[in-house]
Amino acid sequence: MIIKKNQIIVIFMTLIFIAPLVIVMLMYRYDWHPGSHSYGELVKPIIKINVPNNLESAKDSSKKVEVSGLMKDKWSLVYITNECKTICENRLYDLRQIHVSFDKDIPRVQRILITLDKNINKIHEKYPDLIILNKPLEDVSKLALQFDRPSYKAIGSENVYVVDPMSNLMMVYSNKIKSQEIRKDLVRLLKYSWAG
């Protein structure tokens, strides 16, 4: 009886060590990759965002934004709109709530509004830490065009874009995706990312 019990233990221990190897070999042979779940659309290939040199911050029109590092060293949540009406205001509120929920990771993320709207005083009062880029119009348009995708134009799409700390556009969240889902993706991204 002791021999049978010992044999069962040896067989069981062997299976514990061999089973993962067999599973991995089968996954490799049949090119099977378990699906991952993210709510946003991964941008393939990644697009390098080049920020025009003459952009001015809406906070202080006499002072230009430091564009050399605008989308570097931090993750950027970018929202692009023609005019900031109800949908825009709701999305900006959602982005602020997402940002605040990051707790210790707040300094790693910045929010940027790219807009052609000149009347941004109300937005600036509501969201003083939001970076608002709205002039000169030619440079704002050049910047917004870089976010265009083959299936839509960035201006008017009401999408949220994620730019990594190396200025690469990497994810797009359509206007149909809820803020909770965006937050889940970003929390996971910040958890596993060393950048920013």
Q: Where are each of the predicted segments found?
A:
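Hydrophobic membrane-insertion alpha-helices, especially the h-region
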Residues: 7-28
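N-terminal "domain-start" segment that seeds a small globular fold
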Residues: 22, 30-69, 90
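Short, surface-exposed patches at the edges or C-terminal ends of soluble domains, predominantly
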Residues: 60-64, 96, 101, 146-147, ...
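Short active-site neighborhood of thiol/selenol oxidoreductases, capturing the structured segment around
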Residues: 67-96
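Structural motif
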Residues: 80-83, 114-117, 135-137
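Structural microenvironment flanking redox-active thiols in thiol-disulfide oxidoreductases
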Residues: 90-129
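Short, internal strand/loop/helix patches
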Residues: 112, 123-158, 163
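Thiol-/selenol-based redox modules, centered on thioredoxin-like
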Residues: 156-196
